[in-house]
């Protein structure tokens, strides 16, 4: 959940090649030659998007595409499909049956038939990032739309680099104080670096970081038991991925760092009815991903 570009989609969405060293007459077969998709099993450890640390294993559908003026990445998760810790609620145990995130970008250059490139900036996009958590009640639902400007950057190196900056409109947010209003901004940077051929596949490094700032959520939220604010105005999530990709199978190991993840104030003391606990929203967690491209 909430991982964005964890598996082979990261490699393929940021690069133009889908196969690795495949001859033209020996390419693998997929359902579509432009809509690339996979089904994944994802194991998460110590994720920090909420007030309590979460571990779970879930099923995921992932898709990515880049065709003419349309650039897309997205996924849909069935949370806790294969189980999780006591704080992880999902499809089978009265939690959310669906969590999804999509990142469509629309090329301004191609839609206007205008070359807007200059310096290292190759192409410009109307960039979007939409997040939806279905939940089973109001306190379990989220609907967030980031919208803004994106670009691809020529680094002169064997790597791909893109940046997006967004304004955020917050609809539902698990009952938080910033619902149904414009509330803050996000800067996203993504990069992809091919490393080497390994064991018949391609080993790559993918990184992306979300910087969220300018929200009023911290100011508008109440105090925790220990006197500090329960929420924050800013947060950071930074992911670092090693991905091994084959024609149909892909494997990823992900390390992610959160600073006040989900805009929860680290060390705030809370009680949800089962005793006091301290928020641990700053620190490291990780994911393991196994997926099949079809």
Swiss-Prot record:
| Membrane topology qualifier | Multi-pass membrane protein
Q: Knockout: what is the outcome? A: Loss of susceptibility to contact-dependent growth inhibition by CdiA-STECO31.
InterPro entries according to UniProt: Channel_Tsx (IPR003055), Channel_Tsx-like (IPR018013), Channel_Tsx-like_sf (IPR036777)
Q: Does the keyword Nucleus apply?
A: no
Q: Which Pfam families match?
A: Channel_Tsx
List, alphabetically, the NCBIfam families matched. PRK15106.1 (NF011686)
Q: Which family does it belong to?
A: Belongs to the nucleoside-specific channel-forming outer membrane porin (Tsx) (TC 1.B.10) family.
Give the protein's recorded name: Nucleoside-specific channel-forming protein Tsx
